[in-house]
């Protein structure tokens, strides 16, 4: 479990982005963090990852204070993250990137298993380069496979739907549904997409740098969709609005 205790963060200019945020992110569930743009979601994700350090407050992982630990040190403890925009590596194959992510040799069977978990036909991708010939959806799923290869127990995904088309997004939802039901790990997904919120065990709403609401996924989504100023899908969109 990760526990945030009174976490605040501000820009060098002094603008407060997170204000005294306290949360418990419990094990073995899919937790969606949502809210309006500029509300503090991505900053919170970066603090969880160790990319940013809070201005004040503590972060505990299974009771251990990890506030000052960087990305590498947190990964060694079992915390990893998926990039919002996957990186291309010309000349590096999918097989190689998954082995590098794992940090040790992987059998072909294991690599195929990782690719199948993210909905890719392994034989078509093992020796493909990680470059611009991959679609946005393919790159996103390979990025998720690299996260799984690290075999960590706590994973943060920052807006995994960014930059992909609708068909790829539908496939991505399938991936997260499968991970939620089959994997013994905690998934924290930063998103405002209703389809992702629908499969969450818990939903946390952040706005103006503070926790606005927090509860079981179905209960929270019902509350959001029955509040006139929170329903975006009534206007034909796939994301939930907080205006």
Regions found by a protein language model. Give the residues of each.
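Walker B catalytic motif
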Residues: 159-160
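Conserved structural motif at the start of ABC-family nucleotide-binding domains
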Residues: 2-4, 17-20
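Helix-to-loop junction immediately C-terminal to a conserved catalytic motif
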Residues: 49
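The feature captures the beta-strand-to-loop junction immediately N-terminal to the Walker
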Residues: 34-36
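Conserved ABC transporter NBD signature motif
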Residues: 57-64, 110
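ABC ATPase NBD coupling module
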Residues: 65-80, 224
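Q-loop/switch helix immediately C-terminal to the Walker
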Residues: 85, 91-107
């Amino acid at each position: 479990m990760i526990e945030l205790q009174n976490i605040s963060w501000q820009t060098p200019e002094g603008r407060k982005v997170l204000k005294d945020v306290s949360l418990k992110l419990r094990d073995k569930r899919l937790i969606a963090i949502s809210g309006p743009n500029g509300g503090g979601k991505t900053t919170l994700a970066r603090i969880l990852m160790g990319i940013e350090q809070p201005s004040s407050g503590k972060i505990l992982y299974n009771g251990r204070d990890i506030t000052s630990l960087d990305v590498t040190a947190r990964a060694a403890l079992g915390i990893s993250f998926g990039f919002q925009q996957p990186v291309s590596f010309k000349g590096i194959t999918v097989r190689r990137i998954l082995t590098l992510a794992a940090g040790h040799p992987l059998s072909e069977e294991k690599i195929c298993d990782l690719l199948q978990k993210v909905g890719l036909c392994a034989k078509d991708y093992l020796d493909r380069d990680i470059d611009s010939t991959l679609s946005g959806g393919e790159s996103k799923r390979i990025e998720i496979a690299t996260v799984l290869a690290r075999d960590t127990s706590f994973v943060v995904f920052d807006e995994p739907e960014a930059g992909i088309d609708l068909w790829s997004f539908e496939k991505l939802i399938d991936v997260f549904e499968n991970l939620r039901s089959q994997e013994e790990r905690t998934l924290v997904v930063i998103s405002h997409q209703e389809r992702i919120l629908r499969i969450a065990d818990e939903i946390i709403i952040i706005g103006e740098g503070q926790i606005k609401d927090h509860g079981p996924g179905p209960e929270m989504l019902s509350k959001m969709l029955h509040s006139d100023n929170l329903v975006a899908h009534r206007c034909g969109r796939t994301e939930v609005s907080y205006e």
